[in-house]
Amino acid sequence: MGKIRKLDDQLSNLIAAGEVVERPASVVKELVENSIDANSTSIEIHLEEAGLSKIRIIDNGDGIAEEDCIVAFERHATSKIKDENDLFRIRTLGFRGEALPSIASVSELELITSTGDAPGTHLIIKGGDIIKQEKTASRKGTDITVQNLFFNTPARLKYMKTIHTELGNITDIVYRIAMSHPEVSLKLFHNEKKLLHTSGNGDVRQVLASIYSIQVAKKLVPIEAESLDFTITGYVTLPEVTRASRNYMSTIVNGRYVRNFVLMKAIQQGYHTLLPVGRYPIGFLSIEMDPMLVDVNVHPAKLEVRFSKEQELLKLIEETLQAAFKKIQLIPDAGVTTKKKEKDESVQEQFQFEHAKPKEPSMPDIVLPTGMDEKQEEPLPVKQPAQLWQPPKQEWQPPQSLVREEQSWQPSTRPIMEEPIREEKSWDSNEEDFELEELEEEVQEIKEIEMNGNDLPPLYPIGQMHGTYIFAQNDKGLYMIDQHAAQERINYEYFRDKVGRVAQEVQELLVPYRIDLSLTEFLRVEEQLEELKKVGLFLEQFGHQSFIVRSHPTWFPKGQETEIIDEMMEQVVKLKKVDIKKLREEAAIMMSCKASIKANQYLTNDQIFALLEELRTTTNPYTCPHGRPILVHHSTYELEKMFKRVM
C-alpha cells in the first residue's frame, strides 16, 4: 500500500489555519476585513479575555444569502474573484477564501446573517463541523461570534502570550484598519469597556487623534503627491515627535494595511537628518495605484506585498516628505504647564500651547559677552574647518589642553512630551455621543501648520550658559541654541558638498599611513578602490593584506586625518557592498562632529553672532546631522505665562 495519502478536509483546514489564524488578532483582522468588503459603514468588535474566550463582530453590511452560508465555510470559496485575471486586479481586502473555514476549524463559531430582503440564517459550527442551520429573524448585516479559540489545538493555545499582549496585538490591527478606512465607524470593546470609537466621517486626522491623542494630531504634517502611477496621501509628525520603534508608522496600499520595510525606510529617508538616531516618526501613508502594479498574493495573511515599480514609489515618498518639511517651521516650542481646562471652556484655547512641563528654574550660569571683563580668562574661539566663519581680528588656535570633551547632549527643555499609544481607555456609554462630538470639534480646531518656509529668523545674542548653550532673542521670544549642534549642521553641509565632488584637492601625508586588514576585509576593500576615491580614500596596496594612504583631501579636519581614515575604513569593511551615497553621508556626519566646537567652550559676542548668521544660511537650521534639535523656542507669551504676568 502506498505511503502517500490525501488529507481529509478537516485536517487540511487545521493545517491551513496555522498560517491564517496565528492568534486572536488574526481572527479580528480577517472578520473585520470581510465586513468592510461587504460594504459595512458601522462595525462593532466585542472581545472577552483578549479574544481567547470570545470574539464578536457585528456589522451593517450586505449580509450573506442563505444558499451561500454553507459554501462560505468551504476552502477557497469566495465571491471576490472569478478567474485568474481577477487575481491581478484585486481591490477587496480578502480574496483567498481561506479565512472563514480556517477560523471555523479551530473554534466554536456562530453566524447570524441576513441580506435584508429575506429571512436571516443562523449557523453554528464547532471545529469545522456544522452543528445547526436554521432560518431566523435578523436585520441586514452579519453578526459572527467566535468562542473558545484553539480549543482543539492545545499546542497553539499553549503558545499564546498574556492577555495584555494579545489585546495589544488586536488594538494595533484595529487601529491600522481604522486609519485605512476612516469612512467606516469602528467600535472596539474589551470585557464591555470601550477602547476605541471612530465616527466614520472619513476624516483620517480625527482617527489619528483618537488613537495617538490630540497633542500628536496637532503636530501632523499633511502629505500629498501624485505621479503617473501613484497617488500618496497621509500625515507624518514633525521631527520633534518621535518614538523608539517603527511600529507607529503605518503604510496602506489600495486600502489594505501592509508591512513593508522598504516603505518605512523611504519615510525615514524623507526625514533624512531631521530624526535623532534610533528614533522614528509617527506616520500614516495611503498609497493608491493600479492593482496590476502590486502583488498582494504573497502570504495567506495578506500583510506582505511586492511592487513592480518599487524604486519610483520610494523616490516619490522621499521627495514628497523632504519637500513638505522645507515649507514649514521646524523650531520646536517649549510649552508651559497649564491646568487641564474644563469642558465648557473654549476648545481653541486648549490648542494654543503644548503642555510640556518646564523644569524649576535654577540660578543660571550665563556669560554676557557684550562687556568682556579683561581679567577673565580669554574665551576659546570656534575651530575653523575650511574657514566656515571667522570672527574679526582673531587669528589663533585654541590650546587643546583647555578644550574639554563634549558632554552627552541633554536638552534643557524637551520639545514635546512622550505620548504613548493609549491601549485601553474606559468610555462611559452615556457619554459616547458627547465624547465623539467633542473630539470632532477639537480636530476641527487643529489648524494647518503655517507654511512659513525654512528660513530661520534673525537672532540677537544675549549670552552663553555653561559654555554650551547660547541664548538669543527676537520679536518672537527667547531662543536657546546648542552651540555644538549648530556648528555641526554648518560643517555637515560644508563637508557634504566637499565629499560629493569628483575632483578632489589632495595634500600629501608626511609619513604614509598603513592600514592592516584581515584577508576577508582586504578582498572586500580591494574590489571598491575606485569607488572609495570618490569619498576621499586614496588607497594603495601594500603587501598581501595591507593598504597605505599617501594623501588625503585638503578639507579633512587638521590633526584628525588618520582618525577619520580609520573610521571611514571601519564603515567600509562592515559593508558587504559599498554604498557610496551612504558612505558619503556617514563621512560628512563624522567629520562635522569632529570639527565642531565642543561643550564648555566660551565664545565672544562676535563669534556667537557669526555662528548664528552662518546657521541661518544652512538648508536645515533646525537639527544637527544626527537629528537632535539645534534650538528651542520660548514665545514671549509662554514666558509671561511662566511668571504669572498673564493668567
Swiss-Prot record:
UniProt-listed SUPFAM superfamilies: ATPase domain of HSP90 chaperone/DNA topoisomerase II/histidine kinase (SSF55874), DNA mismatch repair protein MutL (SSF118116), Ribosomal protein S5 domain 2-like (SSF54211)
Single Gene Ontology MF annotation: ATP binding
Coiled coil: none
Keywords: DNA damage, DNA repair
PROSITE patterns xrefs: DNA_MISMATCH_REPAIR_1
InterPro entries tied to this protein: DNA_mismatch_repair_CS, DNA_mismatch_repair_MutL, DNA_mismatch_S5_2-like, HATPase_C_sf, MutL/Mlh/PMS, MutL/Mlh/Pms-like, MutL_C, MutL_C_dimsub
Domain of life: Bacteria
Record has DNA repair as a keyword: yes
BP-aspect Gene Ontology terms: mismatch repair
Listed GO CC annotations: mismatch repair complex
Family membership noted in the UniProt record: Belongs to the DNA mismatch repair MutL/HexB family.
Function: This protein is involved in the repair of mismatches in DNA. It is required for dam-dependent methyl-directed DNA mismatch repair. May act as a 'molecular matchmaker', a protein that promotes the formation of a stable complex between two or more DNA-binding proteins in an ATP-dependent manner without itself being part of a final effector complex.
Xref: HAMAP family: DNA_mis_repair (MF_00149)
Protein name (database record): DNA mismatch repair protein MutL
Species of provenance: Bacillus cereus (strain G9842)
Gene from which the chain derives: mutL
